[in-house]
Swiss-Prot record:
The gene is gltX2. This is Glutamate--tRNA ligase 2. Gene3D superfamilies: 1.10.10.350, HUPs (3.40.50.620). It comes from the Bacteria. It comes from Helicobacter pylori (strain HPAG1). Belongs to the class-I aminoacyl-tRNA synthetase family. Glutamate--tRNA ligase type 1 subfamily. The keyword Plastid does not apply. Pfam families: Anticodon_2, tRNA-synt_1c.
Length: 439
């Protein structure tokens, strides 16, 4: 089984979605079940409704799953596994207070050495009646694993101490709950961000302590860097939020296309998630950080907009009139996102706001003069734009730039865009709706 394990503590990050996509693809390739596990054991950080938002985004992205579980439902199992380790003398109670440990951390900082928990501290404060935590006994050997992307990764014994499995309130720590559940659901491969590399030796030690004989394979994805700062994209970066990208009008298929492409060798530029299942390989992923490029994402989105079938295009733009399909196709040529396309068609069909667009009083007067001339015309009697243009010029007594700029604004709501002769047939059939001024 493969899994994607998001926490409902904020918006879904593109790095998380990338991991979800890769786990989903490999599950499909290997004909294995795909599990979604909502890691909701951190009650203080959970945000109400974020779990459903994550699931809706996954559905919208075309990612389906075979099983959905909430980690909090397994808390009794986590405690049972901790009890097992205590009985087998692989774990122990630690009574050291938070204050004591903070003092030791400060001491290590002042002495410019890494902080490492010492097992002898476990019973120093036992008589103070602190509720204990449960710790896994530190290893006396190195922990190494062969990462599917990073190759061999090794942690020496002095890099690992006796870490906490259960907190004072008997809630499981991230690494313990995560590992227990991975074993419970027989997860065989975990693809996740490289920020989890430091968690992996701890999870391997827990697996070994619990008697697992089937080692899990890990693949840690390089981080995604911001295109401007070159730093890791954080949750504060708008473009790192999948929700923001979707709201900006990026199609799910384009987002998936982009996230599969960056830091990867792909056989073609534009493809769907189903196509990627045919050829995707972890071996083709680079070990170097990927750089986010919004301009390239926009380019891919533009290509996918062009591939939309008529029915989907009408649905996504909320246009009910099939006669406007040709116009939508023309507008797509200059749009990078669905939001831009919707704005184009809205400006075309809505009353025009010349107050917003006029440069001076003279320009406003020219707009009004041309508007009055156009209102007296029956657009449908003209065989082409040229004959329409000549008559509009004659009636308005305008020509050149004084004619064309107001004309474009009155007919499209924009001062630039697709050539008017190309969209004139659509203007003709909708001119009564098109030729309106905002009050």
């Amino acid at each position: 089984m493969l899994r994607f394990a998001p926490s409902p503590t904020g918006d879904m990050h593109i790095g998380n979605l990338r991991a979800a996509i890769f786990n989903y693809i490999v599950a499909k390739q290997q004909h294995k079940p795909f599990l979604i596990r909502i890691e909701d054991t951190d009650k203080e950080r959970n945000i109400e409704g974020k779990d459903q938002e994550i699931l809706e985004i996954l559905k919208f992205m075309g990612i389906s799953w075979d099983k959905l579980v909430y980690q909090s439902h397994n808390i009794d199992y986590h405690r049972e596994m901790a009890e097992k380790l205590l009985k087998e003398n692989k774990a122990f109670y630690c009574y050291a207070s938070t204050e004591f440990l903070e003092r030791e951390k400060e001491k290590a900082k002042n002495e410019k050495r890494p902080f490492r928990y010492l097992d002898e501290w476990a019973t120093l404060e036992k008589d103070k009646h602190h509720a204990p935590v449960v710790r896994l006994k530190a290893p006396n050997h190195a922990v190494s694993f062969n990462d599917a992307i990073k190759k061999e990764v090794k942690f020496e014994p002095d890099e690992l101490d006796s870490f906490v499995l259960l907190r004072q309130d008997k809630s499981p720590t991230y690494n313990f709950a995560c590992t227990c559940d991975d074993l419970l659901y027989e997860v065989s491969l975990i693809i996740r961000g490289e920020d989890h590399v430091s968690n992996t030796p701890k999870q391997i030690l827990i697996q070994q302590a619990l008697g697992s004989n089937d080692p899990i394979v890990y693949a840690h994805l390089p981080i995604i860097l911001d295109e401007v700062s070159g730093k890791k994209m954080s949750k504060r970066d708008e473009a790192s939020s999948v929700k923001w990208l979707l709201n900006q009008g990026f199609l799910p298929v384009a987002i998936a296309n982009y996230l599969i492409t960056i830091g990867n060798k792909v056989p073609k530029e534009v493809f769907s998630l189903d196509e990627a299942i045919e050829w995707f390989s972890l071996e083709n992923l680079s070990n170097s950080p990927a750089h986010f490029n919004l301009k390239y994402l926009k380019h891919l989105n533009h290509e996918h907009l062009k591939l939309l079938d008529d029915e989907k295009l009408l649905k996504l733009t909320s246009i009910k009139d099939k006669n406007l399909l040709g116009l939508l196709r023309l507008f797509i040529e200059e749009c990078g996102t669905l939001l831009e396309l919707k704005e184009k068609i809205s400006l075309f069909l809505e009353p025009k706001d010349i107050v917003k667009t006029y440069e001076n009083e003279d320009f406003k007067e020219r707009c009004l003069a041309l508007f009055n001339a156009l209102k007296s015309m029956d657009f449908q009697v003209y065989k082409d734009f040229e004959s329409f243009k000549k008559e509009a010029m004659r009636l308005s007594q305008l020509k050149g730039k004084d004619f064309f700029k107001p004309l474009r604004i009155l007919l499209t709501g924009n001062s630039h865009g697709v050539e008017l002769p190309l969209i004139f047939p659509y203007i003709q059939s909708h001119y009564q709706e098109v030729l309106r001024l905002k009050a």
